[in-house]
């Protein structure tokens, strides 16, 4: 009945872990190296990478979006964060790799405990940031060992059937969606470069390239990125380094008006030539590959470090992008609510599966006529699978959604006017008292973020406890951030702002972030409630001395009333739910079909009714 066109459920190819690790050790020995540290990354430090950059998955079998392995002569470890500990345990051969929670033991600490004096640890300078490489070098030095560049990457030497780099077509991102011409953006960037007293800014982040030049690509699944570099001087045209096979004549003609187009293969040579002149290049040490700094400095140039100015420009949406976000979330809300109504009809018989749910939801989004892609592979977790934070269902793991279980669905869409990301946890049948209690604790944290009022300069780290306070009081917590930034028809995970213990960037008006506290009971169920929120001007307070900010909730989808324990909520919390549901109903009713309208009317009734 339904099908998924933008995501597959194929099982990951079983990694021949033992033979591959032994082949890697042989290659390292041939190069005189004791070991190798390998993160899941590419030259651009992307979170989502092309298939040809999936070295970590090829070597270890782990397919999560974040992780690092260290392979030494006699041992190996895979480092993952709390989102992926359960997934890694099912995908990785524990007889070869020790699975380590990076929050408890980061790689540098592990290296200090396991490297032998005089050891030579290889690293690919393209896959580590400047900061990251320096941290590793210190850890090696403390252990009496040495960090050694390993180029070309040793894994590439043994990965004989490695896929070719992608050649995805580049499209122009129209002004009616971008809200600012590329020429204007580049002028702003040039001004920043001049203010920084640099001779050039190297743009290595494809998100920044896409934003600055008003282009989108198809080199990375679910994120419309063109893999490219750029160099922007304080005056004159920037240079855009991109494979010309990705550019149609029309796109190339448009770009040539604002940039000098170069082949990707020219980038290293021209960056080296730039360094030979002794000029100063600006790099973001937290996001730029260590290889870039090495190229500039070894050729005689200078590197100044600091935050990429484009990251903040991109994160603060302009009025056109904000209006696009409203339109995208309304459209997405219609599709998501249609799905939830359908789910309530189909799930109680116990025959509906996790894959069938994903296929239906994607189909409903495609029915809008404007879906370009999903924004990430949908997380469709029934019962115990919901406790795997970034669970990805495959044909081997697919299971029915059974009565008496919780079903967690985390998904999103890519539209030219905006990117969406939403999680709902749904009761199938009658939930237990514990499920209702835990869900309500999560909901209280979600509401606390949604209702937050905060002064200019407030960071995500300062807001993060709002989402956890009620869970903490019950001796509970969740092992992931509360929120991440979201792009405008770009990545569903966008920096620099986030709501987490590590979120040190002040939140600014125009930023879009997620609000997604959760709770996960291993082997039983998972709970997460996620809406996207927009930072807006806060209320005017009589006698107040500081400008205030607040959040506007963008997502328009009901929250499952069956899981809410009303007695645990304050008057203000109940009021927030009622106002939110009234807003959802008013927005979605006119655009919903008859069956969905009936369901929506019941789903948005005041608490205690129905």
Which residue stretches match the model-derived regions?
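Active-site neighborhoods and metal-handling regions in enzymes and metal-associated proteins
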Residues: 1-610
């Amino acid at each position: 009945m339904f099908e998924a066109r933008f995501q597959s459920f194929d099982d990951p190819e079983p990694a021949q872990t033992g033979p591959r690790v032994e082949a890697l050790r042989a290659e390292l020995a041939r190069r005189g190296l004791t070991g190798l540290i390998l993160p899941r990354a590419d030259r651009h430090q992307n979170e989502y990478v092309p298939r040809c950059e999936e070295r970590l998955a090829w070597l270890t079998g782990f397919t999560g979006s974040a992780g690092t392995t260290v392979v030494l002569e006699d041992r190996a470890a895979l480092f993952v964060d709390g989102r992926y500990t359960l997934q890694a345990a099912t995908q990785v051969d524990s007889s070869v790799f020790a699975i380590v929670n990076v929050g408890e033991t980061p790689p540098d600490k592990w290296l200090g405990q396991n490297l032998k004096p005089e050891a030579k640890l290889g690293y690919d300078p393209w896959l580590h940031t400047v900061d990251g490489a320096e941290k590793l070098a210190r850890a090696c030095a403390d252990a009496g060992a040495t960090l050694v560049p390993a180029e070309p990457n040793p894994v590439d030497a043994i990965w004989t059937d490695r896929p070719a780099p992608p050649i995805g077509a580049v499209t122009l991102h129209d002004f009616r969606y971008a809200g600012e011409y590329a020429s204007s953006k580049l002028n702003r960037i040039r001004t920043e470069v001049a203010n920084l007293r640099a001779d050039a800014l190297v743009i290595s982040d494809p998100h920044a390239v896409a934003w600055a030049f008003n282009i989108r690509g198809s080199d990375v699944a679910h994120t419309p990125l063109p893999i490219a570099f750029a160099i922007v001087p304080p005056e004159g045209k920037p240079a855009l380094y991109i494979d010309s096979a990705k550019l149609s004549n029309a796109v190339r003609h448009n770009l040539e008006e604002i940039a000098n187009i170069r082949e990707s293969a020219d980038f290293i040579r021209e960056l080296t030539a730039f360094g030979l002149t002794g000029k100063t290049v600006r790099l973001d040490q937290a996001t730029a590959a260590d290889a870039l700094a090495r190229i500039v400095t070894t050729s005689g140039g200078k590197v100044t470090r600091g935050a990429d100015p484009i990251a903040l420009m991109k994160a603060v949406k302009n009025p056109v992008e904000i209006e696009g976000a409203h339109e995208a979330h309304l459209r997405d809300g219609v599709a998501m609510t249609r799905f939830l109504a359908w789910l309530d009809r189909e799930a109680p018989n116990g025959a509906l599966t996790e894959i069938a749910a994903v296929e239906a939801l994607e189909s409903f989004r495609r029915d809008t006529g404007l879906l370009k892609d999903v924004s990430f592979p949908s997380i469709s977790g029934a019962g115990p699978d919901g406790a795997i934070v970034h669970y990805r269902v495959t044909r081997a793991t697919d299971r029915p959604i059974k009565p008496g279980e919780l079903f967690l669905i985390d998904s999103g869409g890519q539209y030219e006017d905006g990117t969406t990301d939403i999680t709902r946890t749904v009761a199938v049948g009658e939930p237990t008292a514990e499920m209702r209690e835990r869900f309500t604790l999560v909901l209280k944290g979600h509401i606390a973020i949604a209702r937050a009022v905060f002064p200019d300069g407030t960071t995500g780290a300062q807001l993060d406890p709002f989402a956890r306070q009620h869970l903490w009081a019950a001796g509970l917590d969740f092992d992931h951030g509360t929120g991440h930034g979201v792009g405008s028809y770009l990545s569903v995970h966008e920096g620099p702002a986030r709501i987490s213990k590590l979120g040190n960037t002040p939140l600014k008006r125009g930023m879009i972030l997620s609000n997604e506290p959760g709770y996960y009971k291993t082997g039983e169920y998972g709970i997460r409630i996620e809406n996207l929120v927009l930072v807006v001007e806060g209320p005017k307070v009589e006698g107040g001395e500081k400008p205030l900010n607040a959040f506007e909730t963008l997502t328009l989808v009901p929250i499952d009333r069956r899981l809410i324990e009303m007695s645990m909520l304050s008057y203000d919390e109940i009021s927030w739910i009622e106002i939110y549901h009234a807003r959802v109903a008013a927005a979605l009713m006119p655009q919903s079909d008859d069956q969905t309208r009936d369901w929506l009317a019941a789903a948005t009734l005041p608490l205690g009714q129905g």
